[in-house]
């Protein structure tokens, strides 16, 4: 019985090796040092040496040392891309579409599993990105902190201009998450020195428009970005 299992186990090992490519260490290190991969992980050089990521959410990383090791995160991502498609929305391809797209192109990954990614597909279709507009709200007189500037991106659909439907677009916003009631001195210090955590938020543009123009009476300056639909979709 044991002898008959040996060829079967060997076949399984070979099939697994064929399913997931094994790039050389040099190639993996080259990709890990690529500026695009470093941007995907929001990495910057550490104060003394090495790397560190601006992202402090452990769910963003697949490797235990991912926040400080771009190469380890890349290797863990490559392994996770070949997880069973039955994981569905929990699959790495669904959680990290930008990583998936880039690694597929760089390593010619033609045999990746095909998870459904239903939640991501629904979310992406709802946004329907086609073009992007940089929005700069003017300062709010009752809030001195607004003079430091605030920008956001408006993601428009294909018919946004022709049908004048910018109100149906989405706004990609990055801002400080402030809890409690810090005094003005502490608020200014923490605001200038990065003492508040920053969060990305995707909200309907009409909500931001109401906040800035109706509630705060602020002017909005719009600058359409020279991006293709493909670039906007990324």
Predicted region positions:
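Sec-dependent signal peptide recognition
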Residues: 2-11
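Low-complexity, highly charged intrinsically disordered N-terminal segments
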Residues: 51-127
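Glycine-rich catalytic cores of cysteine/serine-nucleophile enzymes that process amide/ester linkages
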Residues: 130-217
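Flexible glycine/proline-enriched surface loops and loop-helix/loop-strand junctions
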Residues: 216-220, 234
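A conserved hydrophobic secondary-structure block that centers on an alpha-helix together
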Residues: 228-234
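N-terminal signal peptide c-region/cleavage motif recognized by signal peptidases
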Residues: 12-16
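Intrinsically disordered, low-structural-confidence terminal and linker regions
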Residues: 9, 19-60
